[in-house]
Swiss-Prot record:
Compartment(s) of residence: Cytoplasm
GO terms for biological process, alphabetical: translation
Protein name: Small ribosomal subunit protein eS1
Recorded GO CC terms: cytosolic small ribosomal subunit
Subunit relationships: Component of the small ribosomal subunit. Mature ribosomes consist of a small (40S) and a large (60S) subunit. The 40S subunit contains about 33 different proteins and 1 molecule of RNA (18S). The 60S subunit contains about 49 different proteins and 3 molecules of RNA (25S, 5.8S and 5S).
Bias type Basic residues, positions: 1-18
Region feature (Disordered): 1-28
Length: 255
């Protein structure tokens, strides 16, 4: 056997593990901010890889969509079945400024609404807001018993369903086309549903009338000023003020 060569010593090196770097050490944390139309602005945190070379962290964040419960945004448990989608449009410092991207119902809520002995009426309307957002709103409604009704079933006739659907379309078109996206997001949860229920009472009594889904089809050209105004961070507030100082004439003492 050759001198200085020990096979037993060299065997141990095979079992050594490679050093694994923690993937979170290369990431930064950013705060997600909701528009000022909601009661709670802080949505949460999101992680992104740090800016390295040509890969910019801001570019990775822009376009991200977050799904948040409306109950958390409004501090109201009555809205727990509504899910709001927020899209990151701008990154300022460590804050991600978001805008409304859509709304949906939880599947368990939708399933709980559908029952026997009643008619389900659905309608969808494509509308354009005053600030050029193209949206598609999906409405859902159910028939209910009339006062002092003995009959178990509450089925509406085809002519009544058509009349109700026409009324729903008219109300949504009227409410959405005369408002901005920010104003419309305030009306969608409750106001439009109550308006439909009230106006269709003469055709057939309705219950559980909701805008179950809002889909954003097209957005206008990105406007940073409009987004900052939506977040209450308008650049006009940061302008400097002119300072007026009292002029004092210098008095020279005679020698």
């Amino acid at each position: 056997m050759a001198v200085g060569k020990n096979k037993r010593l060299s065997k141990g090196k095979k079992g050594l593990k490679k050093r694994t770097q923690d993937p979170f050490s290369r990431k930064d944390e950013y705060s997600v901010k909701a528009p000022s139309t909601f009661a709670v602005r802080d949505v949460g945190k999101t992680l992104v890889n740090r800016t390295t070379g040509l890969k910019n962290a801001n570019d990775s964040l822009k376009g991200r969509i977050f799904e948040v419960s409306l109950a958390d945004l409004q501090n109201d448990e009555d809205h727990a079945f509504r899910k709001v989608k927020l899209r990151v449009d701008e990154v300022q410092g460590k804050n991600c400024l978001t805008n409304f991207h859509g709304l949906d119902f939880t599947s368990d809520k939708l399933r709980s609404l559908v029952r026997k002995w009643q008619t389900l009426i659905e309608a969808n309307v494509t509308v354009k807001t005053t600030d050029d957002y193209l949206l598609r709103l999906f409405a859902i409604a159910f028939t209910k018993r009339r006062p002092n009704q003995i009959k178990k079933t509450t089925y509406a006739r085809s002519s009544q369903i058509r009349a109700i659907r026409k009324k729903i379309t008219e109300i949504i078109q009227r409410e959405a086309s005369t408002r901005t996206l920010a104003q419309l997001t305030k009306l969608i949860p409750e106001v439009i549903g109550r308006e439909i229920e009230k106006s269709t009472h003469g055709i057939y009594p309705l219950q559980n009338v909701h805008i179950r889904k809002v889909k954003l089809l097209k957005s206008p050209k990105f406007d940073l000023g409009a987004l900052l105004a939506l977040h209450g961070e308008s650049s006009t507030d940061d302008k400097g003020q002119k300072v007026e100082r009292e002029f004092k004439e210098q008095v020279l003492e005679s020698v």
